[in-house]
């Protein structure tokens, strides 16, 4: 189906409607699963030697020193323009402001007299950040991951990226307080972070995007007892735009294309009650597409994308909630009024002047977001992902005495005798003291 084909939602059967919102398949092939499993086991067994072999095989790079030196990082920064460094600093300032505001206040309450309950927050001790390489290094992801890690107070923050690591990535890592950087990419980097090697430290939790092999490696290590936790399930990028008759077609088209250029498996959807706007957006997409260096990639993504005409904006919101997009852009005259009705989205962009690019780089929100429908149960990345919450309780003698019979009754009902005894013994001890 061509992206300039308008689809009348209300003329479609329920089966057709479900098909329109179906995402491209992303399940890992058996060969990827087996290859990744072998890589994980090899890195765990052979450490740095395996990492160097995989760099030569996959990255076509002979790596002598896996760890990047401070001198190399300084040299990378010197090669960058002041304009870019200033832009990174400005972005980090906004990211810091937004994520610092997410700090949870401690909870300290008496649930009843003499029964004190608390919730306290602690940082994840060590985290590993994975940043893909390639022709367009995602240094902005360094800002999005390393900044909240620093605010959270993570004691060890390390980064892996395929060699040779781009200057922008090295500078961004230094700017955000990353302590160690390693010339390691792919599934082997995930293995090194999960299990540790002679050079790369083992971490508690791994963050960051990647290709099918990286995604599968993260999935596998998260399910191994000797592995590591991960940030969230990953899938292709996606955007859904809700537009009304007052939307600017060129703006809408540019937002759709900014997502489509990410990769051929990205998906973009336009929902609008105005067929004329849909037609104008399709025309604007074609005009802008002709000027994009990554036009071939974007065109492939558009083949799985949709222009859908609805009855009204309320129906647009209902369809969006059903789909649960990673990015939701609302270009309507009442954009703010629609927010309360949105139930599933990774990040929402309101009005004509809030392009997705703002959140991708510098507004302050995090651009690491749940995709592939995981917005139904997962949140956008934030400070809490680099922290853990712990509860504390303390009962005075009087508080314990008042609660004892309740605990004994509940424990007896569950036939957990030792639980009941732990209370009864203390009750008897208090009676003896009286």
UniProtKB/Swiss-Prot annotation:
Chain residues that bind substrate: 237, 259, 262, 327, 360, 414, 419
Entry GO terms, CC: cytoplasm; cytosol
Positions that bind Zn(2+): 259, 262, 360, 419
Gene designation per UniProt: hisD
GO biological-process terms attached to the record: L-histidine biosynthetic process
Pathway: Amino-acid biosynthesis; L-histidine biosynthesis; L-histidine from 5-phospho-alpha-D-ribose 1-diphosphate: step 9/9
GO molecular function term, any single one: histidinol dehydrogenase activity
SUPFAM superfamilies per the UniProt record, alphabetical: ALDH-like
PANTHER family: HISTIDINE BIOSYNTHESIS TRIFUNCTIONAL PROTEIN (PTHR21256:SF2), HISTIDINOL DEHYDROGENASE HDH (PTHR21256)
The protein's assembly and partners: Homodimer.
EC numbers, comma separated: 1.1.1.23
Obligatory cofactor(s): Zn(2+); Mn(2+)
Activity regulation remarks: Activity is lost when the metal is removed through urea denaturation or chelation, and can be regained by addition of metal.
Protein's organism: Salmonella typhimurium (strain LT2 / SGSC1412 / ATCC 700720)
Source species, domain of life: Bacteria
Enzyme active site: 326-327
Protein name: Histidinol dehydrogenase
UniProt keyword annotations, A-Z: Amino-acid biosynthesis, Histidine biosynthesis, Manganese, Metal-binding, NAD, Oxidoreductase, Zinc
Binding site for NAD(+): 130, 188, 211
Functional description taken from the UniProt entry: Catalyzes the sequential NAD-dependent oxidations of L-histidinol to L-histidinaldehyde and then to L-histidine.
Effect of residue 117 to A/S: Almost no change in activity
Cofactor note: Binds 1 zinc ion per subunit. At high pH manganese can replace zinc.
């Amino acid at each position: 189906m061509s992206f300039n084909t308008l689809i009348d939602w209300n003329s479609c059967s329920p089966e057709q409607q479900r098909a329109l919102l179906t995402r491209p398949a992303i399940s890992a092939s058996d060969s990827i699963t087996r290859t990744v499993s072998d890589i994980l086991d090899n890195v765990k067994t052979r450490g740095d030697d395996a990492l160097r072999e995989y760099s030569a095989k996959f990255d076509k790079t002979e790596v002598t020193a896996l760890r990047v030196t401070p001198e190399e990082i300084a040299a990378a920064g010197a090669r960058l323009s002041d304009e870019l460094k200033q832009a990174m600093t400005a972005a980090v300032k906004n990211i810091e402001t937004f994520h610092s505001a997410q700090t949870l206040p401690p909870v300290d309450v008496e649930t009843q007299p003499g029964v004190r309950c608390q919730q306290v927050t602690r940082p994840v001790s060590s985290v590993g950040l994975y940043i893909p390489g390639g022709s367009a290094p995602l240094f902005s992801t360094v800002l999005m991951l390393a900044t909240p890690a620093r605010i959270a107070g993570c004691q060890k923050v390390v980064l892996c990226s395929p060699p040779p690591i781009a200057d922008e990535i090295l500078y961004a890592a230094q700017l955000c307080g990353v302590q160690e950087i390693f010339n390691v990419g792919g599934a082997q980097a995930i293995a090194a972070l999960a299990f540790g090697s002679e050079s790369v430290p083992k971490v508690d939790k791994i963050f960051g995007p990647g290709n099918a092999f990286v995604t599968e490696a993260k999935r596998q290590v998260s399910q191994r007892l000797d592995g590591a936790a991960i940030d969230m399930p990953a899938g292709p990028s996606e955007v859904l735009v809700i537009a009304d008759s007052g939307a600017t077609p060129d703006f809408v088209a540019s937002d759709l294309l900014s997502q489509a250029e990410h990769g051929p498996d990205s998906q973009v959807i336009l929902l609008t009650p105005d067929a004329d706007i849909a037609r104008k957006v399709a025309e604007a997409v074609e005009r802008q597409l002709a000027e994009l260096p990554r036009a071939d990639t974007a065109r492939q993504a558009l083949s799985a994308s949709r222009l859908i005409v609805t009855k009204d904006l309320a129906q647009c919101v209902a369809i969006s909630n059903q789909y649960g997009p990673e990015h939701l852009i609302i270009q309507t005259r009442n954009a703010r009024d629609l927010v309360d009705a949105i139930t599933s989205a990774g990040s929402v962009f309101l009005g004509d002047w809030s392009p997705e690019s703002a959140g991708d780089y510098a507004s302050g929100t995090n651009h690491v977001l749940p995709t592939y429908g995981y917005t139904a149960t997962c949140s956008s990345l934030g400070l809490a992902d680099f922290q853990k919450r712990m509860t504390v309780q303390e009962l005075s003698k009087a508080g314990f005495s008042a609660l004892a019979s309740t605990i004994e009754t509940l424990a007896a009902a569950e036939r957990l005798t030792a639980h009941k005894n732990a209370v009864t013994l203390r009750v008897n001890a208090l009676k003896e003291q009286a």
